[in-house]
Amino acid sequence: MPSTRYQKINAHHYRHIWVVGDIHGEYQLLQSRLHQLSFFPKIDLLISVGDNIDRGPESLDVLRLLNQPWFTSVKGNHEAMALEAFETGDGNMWLASGGDWFFDLNDSEQQEAIDLLLKFHHLPHIIEITNDNIKYAIAHADYPGSEYLFGKEIAESELLWPVDRVQKSLNGELQQINGADYFIFGHMMFDNIQTFANQIYIDTGSPNSGRLSFYKIK
């Protein structure tokens, strides 16, 4: 099992820091929203909660953002499905989840997509940022348990897939996670950004709704 990858980002290096919900191949929508936010790549940072690919029409264009110094991402379950398909040769689950875009690419584009997706073997599962003494932890779906600790070993699947915590929250059973002030997640789709206890869910379903949500850390 691969070890859990954490990364700390120094907020002082940037004018503004935004976290974006699941992009799912909506490159043009992302660019439009960044323009509306007056995002300036030379001094701002954009962090994705993962699931950059699938469903939308421009997954490769979104993956190419990994080459830009102003963009980074944690790993999502859709990136994990793609990597598993490459490693096992069984792409059925990925195809059923929107991975068909890959097979519409030509050979050189497919190789480029593979090379970019392989970056998720090294990109973090969790990003930690502290700004104005407020500590944020960013992961794709959840941070299991009730205590966050930078560097704690966690099974990758527990960060990429679970929805049980948020489902309990929807039923009124709020669960605080200690160790950070706020946790920012995607994965679970809502019409608008939702906050339960100290967990903020920012996936608003861009391919189906035309909504792509951002949370401003700084």
Curated annotation (Swiss-Prot):
Cofactor note: Binds 2 manganese ions per subunit.
Gene3D superfamilies the UniProt entry points to: 3.60.21.10
GO cellular component: cytoplasm
Class of the enzyme per the UniProt entry, highest EC level: hydrolase
Residue positions binding Mn(2+) 2: 51, 77, 187
GO biological process: RNA decapping
Domain of life of the native organism: Bacteria
Cofactor: Mn(2+)
Keywords, ordered alphabetically: Hydrolase, Manganese, Metal-binding, Protein phosphatase
CDD domains per UniProt: MPP_PrpA_PrpB
Stored PROSITE patterns: SER_THR_PHOSPHATASE
Any one Gene Ontology molecular-function term assigned to this protein's record: metal ion binding
SUPFAM superfamilies reported for this sequence: Metallo-dependent phosphatases
EC code(s) of this entry: 3.1.3.16
Catalysed reactions, as listed in the record: O-phospho-L-seryl-[protein] + H2O = L-seryl-[protein] + phosphate; O-phospho-L-threonyl-[protein] + H2O = L-threonyl-[protein] + phosphate
Its biological purpose: Has been shown, in vitro, to act on Ser, Thr and Tyr-phosphorylated substrates.
Family per similarity comment: Belongs to the PPP phosphatase family.
Name used for this protein in its record: Serine/threonine-protein phosphatase 2
Organism whose genome encodes this protein: Escherichia coli (strain K12)
UniProt lineage: Bacteria, Pseudomonadati, Pseudomonadota, Gammaproteobacteria, Enterobacterales
Primary gene name: pphB
